[in-house]
Amino acid sequence: SFTCSEFGLSAERVTLEGLEDVTAYAISGTPSDCAKLGMQLMGEWPDLVVSGINHGSNLGTDTLYSGTVGAAMEAAIYGVKAIAVSNYAFEPENFDMCIYGLERTMQLMEEHNELMLLNVNAPDGAREECKGVKLTPLGFHKYPTEYDLMPNENGEEMFYSRRGIVYMSRENDDVDDRWLQ
């Protein structure tokens, strides 16, 4: 176990149940810092970095804010193929379809060597329920810019973003957020 105080990261070698022969670390820090330090600790660059599984989708412009996608992007910046994986549900019960999507995406990356970074969004459920896997460009949506001043659970006044989403992609665009609606 060691700490890199300048960046506020710590890393501890861990054993993963069922994967005892795999070198693994638990790293604190931002997702992109964890990916970069993890690659360094491996001693040599990995063939693939998988980030996730995130609870909740990372669709369209959400990818610009996503730590899950950011970690995958960090790997791709250094020339390592990367996949970000998200479960559409915020409280997932079954990650099987995410695993299936990851497996299919890994096959796709093997078949098309030019693919460096892909983002997988899968619904919650069993792989047998999967209706297919589709490669699409990112959609475009935005959130309200208004904030409301309200008390939090401790009675402190806090600003909260208004809920809602505005889809900017056209209805017939073949983009990611249209396939999971």
Predicted feature descriptions by range:
Residues 1-39, 45:
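A cross-family phosphate/adenosyl-ligand binding-site feature
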Residues 76-97:
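Glycine-rich phosphate/pyrophosphate-binding loops
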Residues 57-66:
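Glycine/threonine-rich flexible loop motifs
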Residues 97-181:
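Electrostatically charged, flexible surface regions
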Residues 38-43, 70-81:
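Alpha-helix C-terminal capping segments
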Residues 46, 82-84, 111-117:
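Short, structured loop/turn "capping" segments at alpha-beta junctions
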Residues 28, 51-54, 85-86, 120-123:
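Short beta-strand segments
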